[in-house]
């Protein structure tokens, strides 16, 4: 569907009946359109993000204006200076934006630190020195007025958080507050905390695993797994708490079931603000469920 939508948007006439036929037609007619569609598909399949909320928890869907080419270029220049200072090369940063399902995916391509790799040919070893390219992603949701960032280091995440705040709203600290997820409702409300009403095609949520840390000086951690944590607790001969009291719930994993999908989608939350989604998971429905 994304390939066909990209072809229609670009004014291409295609009639391929399979994914392969459609991709081949687009490649022959407009390789760049196919490349951009492929990039979008990679973006929506990213699974691990850190989330930051805006200063005002308001719906910005109507007021938000996407960044123009000049602002994207200015952002790339500012990022490039940071990358040069941190051994990632100069003149490598590029910023592109893709509008996908009401959100704006910013892909940041830049150089990484130098790599040395051994190459062997005809029983001779040579060393290759090169700077690999790295892709990072920031996703802004106008409806939730929050940004989520996929990057390898804390320094890069802080950099993007400030730059997105500055370029989108003129304030580098606009996204300074980490959007903290709360797992306490699992303790307080039990299975009722898994209510999915009003979350689009999301039909059911099941708690599969949790991690509880005890601050007793012994670094004690309890991890429990089951096909259904709350269901397993109900089935025990001797009733007790599904999740032990007296500790801090620091991580939880869920199976989410969507309408028309047989296989559950995996979701993991690690406090305070890290969210990992399984492949093909509907990120927007999950974010609404967690809001």
Question: What is the role of each PLM region?
Answer:
Residues 1-291:
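Intrinsically disordered, low-complexity, charge-rich terminal extensions
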């Amino acid at each position: 569907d994304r390939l066909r939508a990209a072809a229609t948007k670009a004014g291409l006439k295609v009639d391929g009946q399979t994914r392969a036929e459609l991709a081949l037609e687009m490649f022959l007619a407009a390789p760049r359109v196919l490349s951009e569609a492929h990039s979008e598909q990679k973006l929506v399949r990213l699974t691990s993000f850190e989330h930051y909320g805006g200063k005002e928890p308001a719906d910005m869907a109507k007021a938000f204006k996407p960044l123009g080419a000049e602002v994207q270029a200015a952002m790339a220049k500012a990022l490039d200076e940071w990358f040069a200072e941190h051994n990632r090369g100069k003149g490598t940063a590029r910023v592109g934006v893709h509008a996908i399902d009401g959100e704006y995916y910013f892909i940041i391509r830049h150089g990484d630190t130098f790599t040395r790799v051994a190459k062997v040919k005809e029983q001779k070893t040579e060393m290759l020195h090169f700077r690999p390219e790295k892709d990072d992603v920031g996703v802004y949701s106008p409806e939730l007025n929050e940004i989520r960032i996929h990057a390898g280091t804390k320094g890069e995440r802080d950099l993007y958080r400030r730059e997105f705040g500055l370029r989108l709203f003129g304030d580098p600290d606009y996204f300074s507050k980490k959007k903290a997820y709360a797992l306490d409702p699992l303790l307080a409300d039990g299975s009722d905390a898994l209510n999915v009403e009003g979350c689009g095609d999301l039909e059911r949520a099941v708690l599969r695993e949790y991690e509880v840390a005890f601050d007793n000086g012994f670094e004690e951690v309890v991890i429990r797994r089951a096909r259904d944590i709350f269901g397993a607790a109900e089935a025990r001969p001797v009733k007790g708490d599904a999740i032990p009291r007296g500790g801090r719930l620091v991580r939880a994993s869920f199976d989410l079931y969507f309408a028309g999908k047989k296989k559950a989608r995996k979701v993991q939350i690690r406090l305070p603000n890290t969210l990992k989604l399984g492949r093909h998971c509907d990120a927007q429905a999950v974010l609404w469920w967690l809001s």
